[in-house]
């Protein structure tokens, strides 16, 4: 059976229980499972798509708990390395009155070395790539030399085993000691990328463009580009056609992981079909609508994982929307 591989950070999101206050004013924090690649993996598992995670955690309570939760959620974890000396990363997240989040700082005071920055290239499980259909990764791992080398080997394995590469930009300046470095490294990553997902702000920052078709023209090897814009819309260039889909309005509690839920749902919809289906406008529109619904539903609960919807919840939500129109 083929699978999806998600590669990258798994960590703890410490989310402020106080709304609309600064980091210094927060009175209490609540820990949640996090890390974009891990969020996508959990979203896929919940939707029923076979998925493995390749990552690195510390040999600490946080790392042990994350591994336990991954297994309980149905994510295959043979590719998760355990570093004996470095700690598992925690990110402190504040929220405004609309549920939109800000990433403030990490655990360990001024520490910059965490387990997820020390992924070993030689310890990547090659057998996972032999039966994989997609490799999903972000860009945060490129900020550390060792994990960047692991990403490089993963891309070579993906090429060797004809695995399609999906990149979610997931720009977070706080992960980089030199943010300009990421802009220099992105073109190298794009050479190995088949499908690219990013937010409108990321598209402006990295490409100075917001049109998926215009970006596809500049990088014509890309098979698909999706640009999300929060609660506004989603624009895409798939199957050599461009399109746009409005998001679904909901009363959001927490937007952490909404983009990850979107991506997991999109991959789930195309996983069981030949990629030639992306030439079918109806199929593409249904896949994007499904992904938009997943992203919206995920914001109804706090934390990136707890709000991730099931296939049934997404289908019922879409059916209800259809009935109203």
Ranges and model annotations:
Residues 134-214, 232-233:
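Conserved beta-alpha-beta core of the PfkB/ribokinase-like small-molecule kinase fold
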Residues 1-76, 325:
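Glycine-rich phosphate/adenosyl-contacting loop at the front of the ribokinase-like
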Residues 127-128, 188-189, 218:
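Structural alpha-helical scaffold elements that stabilize or flank donor/cofactor-binding regions
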Residues 3-5, 156, 208-325:
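Conserved phosphate-binding/catalytic region of the ribokinase-like
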